[in-house]
Amino acid sequence: MRPSQRQPDQLRTVRITRNFTRHAEGSVLIEMGDTRVLCTASVEENVPPFLRGKGQGWVTAEYGMLPRATHTRSSREAAKGKQTGRTQEIQRLIGRALRSVIDLKALGERQITLDCDVLQADGGTRCASITGAWVALYEACDKLVQAGKLPANPVRDHVAAISVGIYKGAPVLDLDYPEDSDCDTDMNVVMTGAGGIVEIQGTAEGEPFTREQMSVLVDLATLGVRHLVAAQQSALAA
């Protein structure tokens, strides 16, 4: 039995709240159980130097955790003067995931930065960040269309992410912190709404996992992503 009493294929309760803050072009609070992440999208009418004059835009991301997002306080990375390797890895993952579903040429020479700030962490923060940031990105692009700066929204498909793993010998969906810290296998799967795989990050924390187990986990993640895409659609329709 899982610590949360959930079924093996059961997501935590997902809530996506749009327009959570006032100033950003896209603003979303995503809650997956007790994990809460604020995702904002900021539009700049310029691109990084390596893209100037090339007729395309850019989407990038930054990720961070509030000092008391976890059980004990962690110092702000700004106070230390550098980001951890984990932070850099996660924000690159978020950026890659979002760029996989947007037409950068259709975006034009502008940059959209997604800031994902973890308010409370209970496992799956990078996955929640991707799922929430997609809604913020779509919202920001929609505002560009409404302002007459784009003829159509350049976001071509949904993208969402979910964790899966092997916990006490059984495959489970959407690991919370107690499961994440005690699982045999931990895997993050990023997929599009059409079912395309963007990225899989899988690690054996204990016993190595088999190819058959990996297939089961990817199937489980596919089920989870379908539910998350439905949650994204509901948020946009609200």
From Swiss-Prot:
Keywords in alphabetical order: Nucleotidyltransferase, RNA-binding, rRNA processing, Transferase, tRNA processing, tRNA-binding
EC number: 2.7.7.56
Statement: the UniProt record of this protein carries the keyword Nucleotidyltransferase: yes
Nucleotidyltransferase keyword on record: yes
Gene Ontology BP terms: rRNA catabolic process; rRNA processing; tRNA processing
Catalytic activity: tRNA(n+1) + phosphate = tRNA(n) + a ribonucleoside 5'-diphosphate
Database matches in Pfam families: RNase_PH, RNase_PH_C
Single Gene Ontology MF annotation: 3'-5'-RNA exonuclease activity
Entry superkingdom: Bacteria
Enzyme class: transferase
Residues annotated as binding phosphate: 86, 124-126
NCBIfam families reported for this sequence: RNasePH
Protein purpose: Phosphorolytic 3'-5' exoribonuclease that plays an important role in tRNA 3'-end maturation. Removes nucleotide residues following the 3'-CCA terminus of tRNAs; can also add nucleotides to the ends of RNA molecules by using nucleoside diphosphates as substrates, but this may not be physiologically important. Probably plays a role in initiation of 16S rRNA degradation (leading to ribosome degradation) during starvation.
Family of the protein in this entry: Belongs to the RNase PH family.
Subunit structure: Homohexameric ring arranged as a trimer of dimers.
Annotated HAMAP family: RNase_PH (MF_00564)
PANTHER family in alphabetical order: EXOSOME COMPLEX COMPONENT, EXOSOME COMPLEX COMPONENT RRP41
The protein's name in its UniProt record: Ribonuclease PH
Species of the source: Dechloromonas aromatica (strain RCB)
Gene: rph
